[in-house]
Amino acid sequence: MNQARGFTLIELMVVIMLIAAAYVLVPRYLFSGVSGADLKASSRDIAAGLRMARAEAVNTRRDTSLTLDMEKRTFTINGAQTRKLPELLEMKLVTAQSEVVNQSQASIRFFPDGSSTGGRVTVASGERKYEVDVDWLTGRVTIAQ
């Protein structure tokens, strides 16, 4: 008798299931963290918040602060508008010592003339990072990769 060689339907289904499981699970372990697009969007959100705080200080002729909470991954402008950032985002803020609230919270303050306390917010995920700089003299906000 001549038997046909090949795979059974069950064997093929098992292989397909294993491939599907690998397709779903492997990217989580290889690419954990924030995507490049989310990282860039987060840096732009922070920059926009800083620019909004500066504009508010100039328009209202009152000091305005943007406060970052590195633990909760949020920032607020004068304690009113809270914006949430991705959980896996790594954040670091360098600012004037007078603006440090505690270990996880600090602010960048803008003055009515447009100047600020200055600082740098670094948002990162793994090796990728963006730096949002605030010039203390002019209050100008820039993003660098």
Predicted regions and their residues:
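N-terminal helix-rich module
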Residues: 2, 13, 21, 25-51, ...
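Residues within the helices of the helix-turn-helix
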Residues: 10
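N-terminal leader/signal peptides at the extreme start of proteins
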Residues: 1-7
